[in-house]
């Protein structure tokens, strides 16, 4: 229960229960209008015991996990391992599950691109730099959605991070700060 409370706070960007309720109500209504199934390649191990199985359906999104019992491929969610998730989405689409539009493979430390999407014809993986760009864009947009008067937003990144982050930040009036390579350097800069 405590972890679910924490996750809702992180997703909503607010500890306020009423705000969280509003956000998750919007999500549920959107999922009712446009059904979505989220496909997850658990690839065995402890990932199969995550809160995703309970939490995602409670949010109005169908959850389709597979490879829950044993590790069947390398654990790093990079394109060569995400093909399994893409294959599963392709199978579901072929079987008539038109709501199977997104998939992922859990990434224990969150530093790899791990998203698969249906492009209307086949499932494709999203390159890591694009996943990060989408994350930056959605986080900044969400901050403005919560508070349209938000000012002084910033993003801390490694020096070699794609320049598309600069473009996104420029459009959303946020500053980019670059650190030397290394997660600790970025965290310290932030």
Task: Label the predicted regions.
Residues 2-190:
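Phosphate-binding chemistry for phosphorylated carbohydrates and sugar-nucleotides
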């Amino acid at each position: 229960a405590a972890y679910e409370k924490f996750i809702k706070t992180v997703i909503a960007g607010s500890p306020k229960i009423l705000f969280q309720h509003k956000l998750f109500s919007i999500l549920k209504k959107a999922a009712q209008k446009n059904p979505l199934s989220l496909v997850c390649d658990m690839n065995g191990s402890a990932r199969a015991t995550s809160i995703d199985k309970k939490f995602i359906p409670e949010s109005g999104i169908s959850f389709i996990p597979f490879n829950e019992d044993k590790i069947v491929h390398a654990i790093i969610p990079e394109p060569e391992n995400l093909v399994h998730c893409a294959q599963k989405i392709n199978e579901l689409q072929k079987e008539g599950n038109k709501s199977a539009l997104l998939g992922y493979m859990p990434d224990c430390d969150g530093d790899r691109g791990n998203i698969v999407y249906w492009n209307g014809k086949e499932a494709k993986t999203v390159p890591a730099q694009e996943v990060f760009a989408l994350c930056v864009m959605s986080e900044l947009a969400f901050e403005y959605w919560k508070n349209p008067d938000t000012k002084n937003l910033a993003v801390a990144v490694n020096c070699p991070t794609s320049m598309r982050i600069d473009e996104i930040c420029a459009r959303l009036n946020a500053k980019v700060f670059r650190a030397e390579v290394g997660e600790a350097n970025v965290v310290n800069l932030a």
